[in-house]
Amino acid sequence: MPKQKTHRASAKRFKRTGSGGLKRFRAYTSHRFHGKTKKQRRHLRKAGMVHAGDFKRIKSMLTGLK
């Protein structure tokens, strides 16, 4: 049986944390900041964690990611 390959688009969007979790980056951060408040922009800078409901599916796409 062939090896399972890492989904390359997912590998560029998620990073593994030291405790085994997955870090993700937030949406709505590319343009149109004039319509957002300072508080919204500040919170969008921070990375988020992948939720438990999505974790198993995303982890299967990232087989080779360390």
Curated annotation (Swiss-Prot):
The keyword Ribonucleoprotein applies. It comes from the Bacteria. InterPro entries: Ribosomal_bL35, Ribosomal_bL35-like, Ribosomal_bL35_CS, Ribosomal_bL35_sf. GO terms for cellular component: cytosolic large ribosomal subunit. Keywords: Ribonucleoprotein, Ribosomal protein. GO terms for molecular function: structural constituent of ribosome. GO terms for biological process: translation. Residues 1-16 have a biased composition (Basic residues). Residues 1-22 are annotated as: Disordered. SUPFAM superfamilies: L35p-like (SSF143034). HAMAP family: Ribosomal_bL35. Belongs to the bacterial ribosomal protein bL35 family. This is Large ribosomal subunit protein bL35. The gene is rpmI.
